[in-house]
Amino acid sequence: MKLRDDIRSQILSKVKKVVVKIGTGVLTTDDGYVDREQIRRLAGQVVELKKMGYDVVVVSSGAIGSGMGELGIEKRPSTLPELQAVAAIGQSKLIGAYDECFKLHGYHAAQVLLTREDFEDRQRYLNTCNTIHTLFQMNAIPVVNENDTISVDEIKFGDNDALSALVTNLLNAELLIILSSVDGLYDRFPTAKSKATVIPIVENISHEIKQLAFDSKTARGVGGMQTKLEAASVVTNAGEAVVIANGRTEGVLKKIVQCENVGTLFLPKEEKLTSRKRWIGYTIKPKGKIYVDDGAMHALAEKGKSLLASGIVAVEGAFSKGDIVSVCKRENRTIFARGLTNYSSQEIEKIKGCSTSHIAKVLGYKLYDEVIHRDNMVIL
């Protein structure tokens, strides 16, 4: 127990910026309405962190759930237009509830609605970062949500666990707190007959850890433990910490930053990625794949080398110079790296397997020695 406390203290005592992701199940009542009392409690805790000197961003789910409650809809809509319309109604109620609660403590709620494009476009990415940091100076608390009304992918495929990881990396925040309806990551599937125990600390999100994820989807929530582990993996690989905890635990946020044994703490990797490498490795959707042989994989993953044409065995997808691509093992097609390519897919198809000295002979020109330079690559 003492060792666990020491580890928590060692990691969490360095935190200055905190991203708090609040799930739908934490924010809404059983009938789907915004739980204003719960928002008031959480808003008070966020303000406490602000007064303790932390910069805090709230990533809030609940727009669709709030809209369903406002409209008296029991069943989650199935069509995209209905989902987007319900989200438009619910988002205004949600941000209004936050603003009302923050104003009781002298703070403003600043609504920040984002789409995938805001992260993938480098200029918009940096503008978003600058805006949020400016809000920190204005006595405002950013409340971030996916723009459900116009964002197709979020409603169909994703949720705010992924968004919270992107925001954490965007801001280089040292801690992501994911508040859910569960106490943390359990060591087994909890049932009436089998008692499950929360794992206090996870050093590495291994295959075995991923197998512990179980689907806790509700009628109004989208993400289960699997998506939370995926978010935790993105953040810890960038060198920051993650805590998954129960959002209805009294004083949960203060307990976490004060290093109490609450929830599951996922330890960060020792090396912190630069902002640019976070953007390359975990923000942009890759446009294609490059498959490499064992020698190239070892040189990239173990020795930190650049990717040369000689180690490439195959190309998948159509992409241009400057696009982000995935780098995969030849045998099992596992993605182990991402990077910014110096050559297009058509060019790589021609020079794959060639030595660097032969590139000019094959193409008639040579743009770079490397297909992907190590400075533009992230090992996942």
Question: Where do the model's predicted regions map?
Answer:
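C-terminal catalytic "cap/lid" subdomain
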Residues: 2-75, 80-108, 112-380
